[in-house]
Amino acid sequence: MEQFDVVVIGAGAAGLFCAAQAGQAGCRVLLVDNGKKAGRKILMSGGGRCNFTNMFVEPAAYLSQNPHFCKSALARYTQWDFIDLMNRYGIAWHEKTLGQLFCDDSAQQVVELLLKECELGQVTIRLRSDVLSVEKNESGFLLQINDLKVSTNSLVVASGGLSMPGLGASPFGYKLAEQFGLKVLPTRAALVPFTLHKPLLEHLQTLSGVSVPAVVTAENGVSFRESILFTHRGLSGPAILQLSSYWQAGEYVSINLLPDADLDAFLNNERQVHPNQTLKNTLAQLLPKRLVECLQTLEQLPDVTLKQLNAPQQAALVANLQQWRVQPNGTEGYRTAEVTIGGVDTQELSSKTMEAHKVPGLYFIGEVVDVTGWLGGYNFQWAWSSGWACAQALAAKQVQ
């Protein structure tokens, strides 16, 4: 049997970072993962460049049944702290839209940074390792990992959510929480494209690949202003992914296809200058022609010239283009979702240490916890912050 101070389950962003920090603080750490590579989701993120944090991280950008839970960890290890770490390793990065920070080169650099940090902490990393059983004993926990028995004082669960099962996602962390009597909140896919009902989808097939800036609004009033992308399955793009976290099955979403236009004024002006111009050609100055043609087949806009367009028709047109109501059929699910909403109930955990109130020595960090960030680096920051908070608690316990 092998003995460790800390075993961390899951070599994703949160697990790697926590293991490294705990190791550097003097803990003897074992990090295990069932995959053949560490940081698989990191490598896939941000189009291979890893959107590693966001300049504008704040608690309001996170969803949780307890919105206050994330505040402590985010305040104690901030985006600036991780940026400092990137700079220390000489990893070049740049800011894209809305405060999103990406590596100039490759997400591999972030994984290499984390592995180097683990090396500095003398962390033992075992990949292709399945945790077959976990038992509580007087001194901590007894784990069966493949054919190896491991004893540990502290157990950190950083096994992630259900999103992207192709990268090894599983319900392991939720089942472990339930094994020890912790409440797990219902989960669903988030930061995920919408699918559409067949009649509307058939009309929109010609738009696959078309992207437009828009403001999308959920029934609860939450809105996002970014681009939307029409796909062969439905709707995607940053604005849609963001809104999916706030959408409930059966609800409508409102899409403003012309968020920057005073459409009434534009049409009135064009009517004076080009009275015989078709409405379709006029709107093609503002929107992709394929989208205008599609909206016409959906009877969202009349087939008339500008001088034929009467006031009621114009009012209806403005409403259709700036408050287009669409009812998604559902989402693409965990297969393409970037994150999972729900998970281990934060009421079960200390917001300062991530330790379970009922089970001393058991910690949950990262996506397995009911804390879900917006698109744009927020979920990576939660991984760094929750991992750091947990590591500080592990280090303090080691000193005792």
Residue ranges and their predicted role:
Residues 76-154, 292:
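Feature captures the FAD/FMN-dependent oxidoreductase FAD-binding
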Residues 154-200:
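Glycine-rich loop(s) and the adjacent beta-strand/alpha-helix scaffold that form part
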Residues 23-47:
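Glycine-rich FAD pyrophosphate-binding loop
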Residues 49-95:
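Glycine-rich active-site loop/strand segments that organize a redox cofactor
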Residues 7-9, 131, 150-166, 177-178, ...:
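Short hydrophobic core segments
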Residues 36-38, 43-44, 52-59, 92, ...:
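An anion/pyrophosphate-binding glycine-rich loop and adjacent beta-alpha core
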Residues 127, 293-372:
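A glycine-rich dinucleotide-binding beta-alpha-beta segment and adjacent secondary-structure elements
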Residues 4-31, 390-395:
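N-terminal Rossmann-like FAD-binding beta1-loop-alpha1 element of flavoenzymes
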